[in-house]
Structure formats: C-alpha cells, structure tokens
Curated annotation (Swiss-Prot):
Its main location: mitochondrion. It is found in: Mitochondrion. HAMAP family: GatB (MF_00121). GO terms for biological process: glutaminyl-tRNAGln biosynthesis via transamidation; mitochondrial translation. Belongs to the GatB/GatE family. GatB subfamily. It comes from Pyricularia oryzae (strain 70-15 / ATCC MYA-4617 / FGSC 8958) (Rice blast fungus). Residues 79-101 are annotated as: Disordered. Keywords: ATP-binding, Ligase, Mitochondrion, Nucleotide-binding, Protein biosynthesis, Transit peptide. PANTHER family: GLUTAMYL-TRNA GLN AMIDOTRANSFERASE SUBUNIT B MITOCHONDRIAL AND PROKARYOTIC PET112-RELATED (PTHR11659), GLUTAMYL-TRNA(GLN) AMIDOTRANSFERASE SUBUNIT B, MITOCHONDRIAL (PTHR11659:SF0). Allows the formation of correctly charged Gln-tRNA(Gln) through the transamidation of misacylated Glu-tRNA(Gln) in the mitochondria. The reaction takes place in the presence of glutamine and ATP through an activated gamma-phospho-Glu-tRNA(Gln). This is Glutamyl-tRNA(Gln) amidotransferase subunit B, mitochondrial.
C-alpha cells in the first residue's frame, strides 16, 4: 500500500471519509428488508459498519428511529429499573445488612479500578482531551484525535510526561512504593474500539507496588469487618498506567459508530489483593479510593460522571466450623464496568448467590467475564475468561523505560492536599458536622459540594464578623452557623432538584435543572447569595420559611436578575418585598399564650405535680402559632413564654 496523501488523511480524521483504494476499498452490502423478526426479543440485531462520521454535537449513545425524539437517558434508566423490579416483585429481598454473608460460605473479592488521570493530554499522542468540567459543550466526535490514536501505519507513541505527575500522586495517595524504573507492555486483543490491536499498559514493571487503603466503620464497611477500633486494611497490589479505548455509539438498527476522542486517554489501573469478604466493604473500598484520588488531585472525575469504573473478581468457597474447606480460593469470575458504588455491592451479591446456587446443585463455576445492568437481580455472561496467554503480553519496542527519581516522589508527597480521613475529622471536630453529613459532603459531585460548603461558610463568617460591635460573635455562634450551612447545603439545596420542584419548573415553562456544582465549588446559586440568606436566618432577621422561599425564588428564576449575585442584592429584595421578621413583643407573646390557655385550660391538669410533658407543651405552642401571626412568632421564644405561663397558672392552682 502506497503512502496516503495528506488530503485524504485529513479528510478521514476530520470527516470520517475513506477513499476507495487498495485495502480501504468499500464493498457495498446487499440491502435487506427489515421485518418484525429483526426486533424479536432475544434476537440480536445484525451489525453494520459505516465510514460516515456522526454529526457534530452528537453526544448520546443511541440513535432513535427517524422522526422520533431521542429518549432522555434518565428515563431509559428509570424504565429499565422499573422493569427489573417488576420481574423480581414476587421475590423476597433481604436487607443490605442481612446480605453481607451466607452461612457456610466465604466470599472473596478482588477489585480493579480504572480512573482517568487529571490531565488535558493523552498518554501517547499530542491530541488534547475534552474538558472534564464543561459537560455542557461536548466536543464533536472524532475531533480530538491524532494519527497515532487511529493506528495509522507509520505512527509511533510519544509518551506525554505531563501524565506522569497525576499518576505518581495517585500511587502516593494509595500508600504505594513508586518504582524507580517502570516500563510499558502491549496487551494484544482485537476489538473495534482498539484500532491498533493491542493496548499499551504496564504488566511486567508497573509504576507502583505494595500499597494499602485503610477502611473504618464510617467508610461504610460491613458490620462484620468492624472490630477492635483498628481499621480494616485492604492491600493494593499495584498501580499501572494504560490507555483508554474509543467510545462506541450504538444505534437501535445495529449500526455502531466510533468516537476516538477518548482513545488513548491516560488511565491508572488500581489492582487490589483479594482481601475483601463482604459486598458493602467492596463498595466502601471503591468509594474510599475515589476520595483519595480526588484529594490528591490525581483523578477529579468520579463514578458520577464516568471518570472511574470498577471491575470485580468474585469467588466463593465452603466454610465448615469456621474453617475454609480448601486453602485454595474458588474459581473466580469477573464482572466488568460497574459505574456506581451501589452497582459494585449489588453485582457482587448477585454473583455470589449465583455461584453458591450453582455449586449447591453440583455444578461447576466457569472462569468467565460477566456483566451487570442497573436494577438487575442476576449477572449475565459476556464471554469466556481470557487467560494471560491469550493476551500475549510483550514489552513495547517503541517505548523506553520510565525513570522516576525519589526526589520527585518526595516533592509530590510534600505538596499533597489534605487526605480524606484528616479532612473528615476536621469537619466533625471544628465544623460540628456529623460523620454522616461530612462524608456526604465529601462524596457529592466528586467533592464539589464540600468546596461549595467551604466557600459558603467563609462568606457567612465574614458577614458575621462585619455586622458590627453590637453583637459579639462567639465560637459557639460560629459552630452553629457552620452546622446550619451544612444542613442547608445537604438537605435544603437537595430539595431544589426534587421531582415536585422540577414539575413546578416544567409548569412554568422552565427546563429541568440540576444544582450545577463544579469540583471548584461553584453552582447556579452562588456561595455569596446563599451566605446572605443564611446570615439573615442565623441572626433571626428572617424566618426559616422565608429563607427557603428566597432560595427557591433564585433557583426557579422568579427573583429578578438585578437582585442576584450583586452586593446587598438579597437584602434589597427582602426589603422591597417586606419579608423581614418583625417579632412579637414580650407583652404580645404573653397575651397570646394567656389567650391560648384560656381556650385549652383543661390541659393544665397534665402539668400538675411538677410534670411537664413535652408533647402537651408543644401542642400549646402549636396553638399559639395557629392563633397568632405565624410570620411574627419565633417557635423557641413561644415555647419559653408558654412554659412560663403554664408554670404560673399551675402554681396558682395549688
């Protein structure tokens, strides 16, 4: 085959057009009639391949039939989950806690985690990568490719050194020993998403070895793994760099398109030792690894956005009188491409139960690769397990060894950010948050919700310090403000994206919207605006209901733009709409409490004998809220006044 002209090569890279010559000569496929049998359940569609590139801006993975709008991905997933639940409706489902063990059997799990490195370069080509932050502007398919990504004959890999730094950070975060010399190898297999016929990875000499991850009860491990106050240590066998594959865009008619923008993206593969014996602990391990990689700035896109996926290797063996029946582990199966923590736990439970049932019936577990779908109750066979011989690993002759000096490793260690365990302890001790709330902040939006929390707290504390000398800001007041901020960012902000509010937006002609939280802590509602609302709420200048109304008004685009993200904008909006809290005077509180007791005097006998049942007291407070001007009543003050009035009346009755 002769040299390909530059014009034809450019046309192929940019538009997907292949000129008919030599081995690239196109053959016309015979036309086939499409009948109902092509869509029968259980009959796979025939695959056809086109050289035509998809139109720019196409980002979905499926193409609808002509004339029909593309279904929303969320709707597809919900429909699949509902269908799976309907099929399993008659089956009794055990709770997660009950599903961690099966009497008479030991589960063993090893995990391989693939995470995309935080860099804008591909591993072996100069082509850029799509931004991990701007999800609203996806690049056109096949627009971020270089000749090497397409395995054009004559092209060679060029190791991009910028990808090495986040990889070393990942290894350090996992307590691994970074190897002074590592090398790249070819893993041979044939699939349409790998045009070269092999993947470049690190099999014989990986980047790092012998690490570990410590898990505690607060990380969500199984109750059976909690004990003695000591953390559960999961060993990390190795960390290696490797290429990602192209993305397949599948259509219902059996045609598949390939997007090579992702081909060659730098990944780290993290391989654990088979130290995990409970499904919940496996999910906790993946969750903890994601947090560690994010804190190290090695991988900033987590499972929520597809930047991290897990493969789990599952095996079982019998246990008799607390001892395993064999020193050798059972035959393992691999479940590929799990994209959520819940999927990791559920897939392991399903595969464990399948293997146990098979062995109880006298069957044999085969070494194979299996898949898992959202909402499923069973794993499904994908293919027979390929052994090491099938991959034909060999050193890559086009790439030299990677040399890493110890001084580089020490420098990266010294510049690492705060690790998750230390940060969680600080959130609990200094910010007053519960471990559960602190963990939620650290996990949501790949840590972006926590950064938004920090920004809001800083802005709120600045407002409290600047409010004047008339009110002293105490340490206790600051902690209460931090707790208030955490509750709002976790719970109240979450209600903005509830189904009820989304229906209200749709009724108002507005499109569905999420919070828009980025990894830097930015969001549709700015931290400054939220801090303004919380400042007025914390200082009792507005009520809880008013504060929520302000938040919803901003999110649902009811509040005019001139009040949003402007100095004192929230304060002006409250003033212009007369929303300030004008509390009752002490005399008005007392008069209201007296009038309520006049109507409910029969309740007083419940308080005789120095007994003050809280339920009865709150009933009277509720009557105060109902009888008076609710927007002017502080519940805490009303409770105190009502208690004083009750004590006075009870004393007079003696």
């Amino acid at each position: 085959m002769g040299r390909i002209p530059t014009r034809e090569l450019s046309s192929y890279l940019l538009t997907g057009r292949v000129f008919s010559r030599d081995c690239t000569r196109l053959q016309r496929l015979p036309a086939r009639n499409i009948s109902k049998q092509h869509f029968a359940v259980g009959q796979p569609a025939q695959r056809r391949w086109n050289h035509t590139a998809p139109e720019a801006g196409h980002t979905t993975t499926t193409q609808p039939p002509p004339g029909q709008p593309a279904p929303h991905l969320r709707k597809i997933l919900k429909d699949q989950a509902k269908a799976s639940k309907a099929q399993a409706k008659g089956k009794k489902k055990r709770s997660s806690a009950d599903n961690q063990t099966v009497p008479g059997w030991e589960l063993t799990v090893g995990i391989e985690i693939h995470a995309q490195l935080n860099t804008d370069r591909k591993l072996f080509s100069p082509a850029p990568l799509a931004s991990t932050e701007d999800n609203t502007r996806a690049p056109a398919p096949n627009s971020l490719v270089a000749p090497f990504d397409l395995a054009i004959p004559g092209t060679q890999p060029l190791f991009q050194q910028a990808t090495l730094v986040p990889a070393i950070r990942a290894a350090v975060a996992l307590n691994c020993a970074v190897q002074p010399v590592s090398s790249f190898d070819r893993k041979h297999y044939f699939h349409w998403d790998q045009p070269s016929g092999y993947q470049i990875t690190q099999y014989y000499a990986p980047l790092a070895r012998d690490g570990y991850v410590d898990l505690r009860a607060r990380d969500g491990i199984a109750a059976q793994d909690v004990g003695g106050g000591e953390p559960l240590r999961i060993r990390v066998k190795q960390v290696q760099m490797e290429q990602d594959t192209a993305k397949t865009l599948a259509r219902p008619d059996g045609v598949h398109w390939l997007d090579f923008n992702r081909c060659g993206a730098p990944l780290v593969e993290i391989i654990s030792e088979p130290d995990i014996h409970h499904p919940a602990t496996a999910a906790a391990f993946v969750r903890k690894v994601q947090m560690l990689l994010g804190a190290a700035d090695a991988c900033v896109v987590g499972m929520e956005k597809g930047g991290l996926r897990a493969d789990v290797n599952v095996s079982v063996r019998r246990v008799e009188d607390g001892k395993t029946s064999s020193a050798k582990l059972g035959q393992r199966t691999e479940i590929k491409n799990l994209f959520s923590f819940k999927a990791v736990e559920d897939a392991i439970i399903a595969e464990r139960d399948r293997q146990i049932k098979l062995l109880d019936e006298g069957g044999v577990v085969l070494g194979e690769t299996r898949g898992w779908s959202l909402g499923s109750t069973e794993t499904r066979r994908l293919r027979g397990k390929e052994g090491e011989v099938d991959y034909r690993y060999m050193p890559d002759p086009d790439l030299g060894p990677v040399l890493v000096g110890q001084d580089v490793v020490e420098h990266l260690k010294s510049t690492m950010g705060v690790m998750p365990d230390q940060e969680l302890d600080d959130l609990v001790s200094s910010y007053g948050l519960s471990e559960k709330d602190a963990m939620s902040l650290m996990l949501l939006e790949d840590g972006g919700r926590l950064q938004f929390y920090y920004k809001t707290v800083d802005a709120l504390e600045q407002r409290l310090q600047n409010q004047g000398d008339s009110t002293k800001v105490t340490a206790e007041s600051l902690v209460q403000a931090r707790i208030l901020t955490g509750n709002w960012i976790l719970h109240v902000l979450g209600s903005l994206t509830s189904e009820n509010n989304q229906r209200d937006r749709a009724a108002a002609g507005l499109s569905e919207r999420d919070l828009g939280v980025t990894s830097e802590g930015d969001a549709f509602i700015s931290a400054d605006d939220l801090a303004d609302i919380l400042f007025f709420l914390h200082t009792s200048r507005i009520r809880q209901g008013t504060a929520k109304d302000l938040l919803f008004a901003m999110f649902n685009e009811v509040m005019p733009a001139q009040y949003i993200s402007t100095p004192a904008g929230i304060e002006r909006y409250i003033t212009d709409n007369d929303l300030w809290f004008s509390e009752l005077s002490p005399q008005e509180y007392s008069e209201l409490a007296e009038s309520v007791l006049d109507e409910e005097e029969h309740v007083l006998k419940e308080f005789m004998g120095a007994r003050y049942p809280q339920g009865k007291l709150m009933f009277l407070v509720g009557m105060m809220m109902k009888s008076g001007a609710r927007e002017r009543i502080d519940p805490a003050t009303a409770q105190k006044v009502m208690r004083d009035v009750v004590e006075t009346r009870v004393a007079a009755m003696k």
